[in-house]
């Protein structure tokens, strides 16, 4: 039975794991690392790079390198968070045909789901390389505070990558699964998850294989990227103060600053001070300029203090919704690379009144939890029951633009809830059901998930028709809504498609694009491999020809030289088949050269053997003397 993989699709890094017996195992990628940068790059030659190779060339290709795209997934172009992001990233964020935020590289538009699918493909290939078999099913994690549109867009990304997404699971819940799988005693835990782009906090009760989420809260636009941005802004301001040059519009310099900021942030988790050195960051008429700034941990903490404090309110809200006090939490589990920052650990300790648990790897625990959930769904992991919740309230817009909740936040999923409504005017023959998600009292202040019309209502005075609206949330946290006229039995049902979102046709097209790209990537790899093989053969044949060319006939020598020339010409192009054919041709004609080399070696060996015999007969006495010496040694010992 094919394995189900668990993927932590992160903002900054992604990770893939699989069940190996009773334990979840994190799989190393082709570069030998256990996490993969969530970065996709398109080079000028239209080559697509994923992960570490993409990150390595970011400085020289800022506009073609896409990072932190997860922050755009499922968001509208006019979302205030997208507007903020547009000024902070070197690549282009544009308006998609459906009104969503998309990205543009080399004049081509991509949806965030497509870019995420490319990262998922890389994770899929990593798993396939380790398992030695094709992988088609996965459990993918999302921030607990993701809304329906963001969850749907993540599921679409999986589909585009050629994966059947068996379950979308919340990141803190996945972490709790990995943390608590082997713990039998009952505990109430809080999972504090501060990653590259999002923050979540979940309160769970765990024990005897039951993982019940009591509440969840968070901020889907708060993470390590914001800490990096804050540091970049500080470096830009300091450099301007010192040199009078503003680096804000220099995309190349900004990319270098971003890399340096990330490195400095990591270093300051273990040391009190670091130095940021960027030679030749820019130049003016007086010559090149260098950036050299010393940064202390205290200064960095003061720069990001408000970001750290922003994590406290969601913690308060999660405890309140769970009906608990901080002292009633038995253990606080830290998840996400940012939780390595000492200041964050201090704040967590101060809020919960206890040292946070550091026994899990914050970068890997989410993927491990996803793999465990995959094992549960496959039947390999027994006696585990996961009860998750919906993070935001769901409801519809009613008279006066009021938001009427049908399902409250932190309701255990899957769940189903119905409520009966009526018409607002006499003889109203149709009603528009507008579905929202959020916590504000007015519908317009919440996230519109979608809308649909129920038509054909018989004429009647206002308030008479009975329209039953039913909300159904599945285990992925994805919403289905239906409306039924009780009088006629007419029903209209929709799976909520975000007001933007991707249609089935869009997804189908993107799946085909992904497959075509995979084919193109495969061809490109084959071409590179063929070239490497050909160049190696040319080099070795030329070397042998220089050494043993006089051992073959003039005709054979010319045939070999012609074959080398033909292969060199072929290597200037990109036709892999032609390169392979010319390589084969050279291999065949150079066999004569191989034969000559073999004969020359044999002749040399024969001559060596003859000389050896003569030498041994003339040195018989020396051999005897050797034996004598050994005897003497024995005597003396």
Curated annotation (Swiss-Prot):
The molecular function terms of the Gene Ontology recorded here are: ATP binding; ATP-dependent protein folding chaperone; unfolded protein binding
Basic and acidic residues bias (residue ranges): 514-529
* Residue stretches of biased makeup (Low complexity): 601-617
Record region (Disordered)? 514-542, 601-637
The record, for InterPro entries, names:
ATPase_NBD (IPR043129), Chaperone_DnaK (IPR012725), Heat_shock_70_CS (IPR018181), HSP70_C_sf (IPR029048), HSP70_peptide-bd_sf (IPR029047), Hsp_70_fam (IPR013126)
Keyword hit for Protease: no
Entry-linked CDD domains: ASKHA_NBD_HSP70_HSPA9 (cd11733)
- Which HAMAP family does the entry link to? DnaK (MF_00332)
UniProt family annotation:
Belongs to the heat shock protein 70 family.
Q: What is this protein called?
A: Chaperone protein DnaK
Biological source species: Brucella suis biovar 1 (strain 1330)
């Amino acid at each position: 039975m094919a394995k189900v993989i668990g993927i932590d699709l992160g903002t900054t890094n992604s990770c893939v794991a699989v069940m190996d017996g009773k334990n979840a195992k994190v799989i190393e990628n082709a570069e030998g690392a256990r996490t993969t940068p969530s970065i996709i790059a398109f080079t000028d030659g239209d080559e697509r790079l994923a992960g570490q190779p993409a990150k390595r060339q970011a400085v020289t290709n800022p506009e073609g390198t896409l990072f932190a795209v997860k922050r755009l997934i499922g968001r509208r172009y006019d979302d205030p968070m997208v507007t903020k992001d547009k000024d902070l990233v070197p690549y282009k964020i544009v308006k998609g045909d459906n009104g969503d935020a998309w990205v543009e590289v080399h004049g081509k538009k991509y949806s965030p789901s497509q870019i995420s699918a490319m990262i998922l493909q890389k994770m899929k290939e990593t798993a396939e390389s380790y398992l030695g078999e094709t992988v088609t099913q996965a459990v993918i994690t999302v921030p607990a505070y993701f809304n329906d549109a963001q969850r749907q867009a993540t599921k679409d990304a999986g589909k585009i990558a050629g994966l059947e997404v068996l379950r979308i699971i919340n990141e803190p819940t996945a972490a709790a699964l990995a943390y608590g799988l082997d713990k039998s005693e009952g505990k109430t835990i809080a999972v504090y998850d501060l990653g590259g782009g999002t923050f979540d906090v979940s309160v769970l009760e765990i024990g005897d294989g039951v993982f019940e989420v009591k509440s969840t809260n968070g901020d889907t636009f708060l993470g390590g990227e914001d800490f990096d941005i804050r540091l970049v802004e500080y470096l830009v301001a300091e450099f301007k103060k010192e040199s009078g040059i503003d680096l804000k519009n220099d995309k190349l310099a900004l990319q270098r600053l971003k890399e340096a900021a990330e490195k400095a942030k990591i270093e300051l988790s273990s040391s009190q001070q670091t130095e940021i050195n960027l030679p030749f960051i820019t130049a003016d008429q007086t010559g090149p300029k260098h950036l050299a700034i010393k940064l202390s941990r205290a200064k960095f903490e003061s720069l990001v203090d408000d970001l750290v404090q922003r994590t406290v309110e969601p913690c308060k809200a999660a405890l309140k919704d769970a009906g608990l006090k901080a002292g009633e939490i038995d253990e606080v589990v830290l998840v996400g690379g940012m939780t390595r920052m000492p200041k964050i650990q201090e704040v967590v300790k101060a809020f919960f009144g206890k040292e946070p648990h550091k026994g899990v790897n914050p970068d890997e625990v989410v993927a491990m939890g996803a793999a465990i959930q995959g094992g549960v769904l496959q039947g390999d992991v027994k006696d585990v029951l996961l009860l998750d919740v919906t993070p935001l309230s769901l409801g519809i817009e009613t008279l006066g633009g009021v938001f009427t909740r049908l399902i409250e936040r932190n309701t255990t999923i899957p769940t189903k809830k119905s409520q009966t409504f009526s018409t607002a005017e006499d003889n109203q023959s149709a009603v528009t059901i507008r579905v929202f998600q959020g916590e504000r009292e007015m519908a317009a202040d919440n996230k519109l998930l979608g809308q649909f019309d129920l038509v054909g209502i018989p004429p009647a005075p206002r308030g008479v028709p009975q329209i039953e609206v039913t909300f159904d949330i599945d285990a992925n946290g994805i919403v289905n809504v239906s409306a039924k006229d009780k009088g006629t039995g007419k029903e209209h049902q929709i799976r909520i498609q975000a007001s933007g979102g991707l249609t089935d046709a869009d997804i189908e097209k993107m799946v085909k694009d992904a497959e075509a790209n995979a084919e193109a990537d495969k061809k490109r790899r084959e071409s590179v491999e063929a070239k490497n093989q050909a160049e190696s053969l040319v080099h070795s044949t030329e070397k042998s020809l220089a050494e043993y060319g006089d051992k073959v006939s003039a005709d054979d020598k010319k045939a070999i030289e012609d074959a080398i020339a033909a292969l060199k010409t072929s290597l200037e192009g990109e036709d892999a088949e032609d390169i392979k054919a010319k390589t084969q041709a050279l291999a065949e004609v150079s066999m004569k050269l191989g034969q000559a080399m073999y004969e020359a070696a044999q002749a040399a060996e024969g001559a060596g053997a003859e000389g050896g015999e003569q030498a041994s007969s003339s040195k018989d006495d020396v051999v005897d003397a050797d034996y004598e010496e050994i005897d003497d040694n024995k005597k003396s010992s």
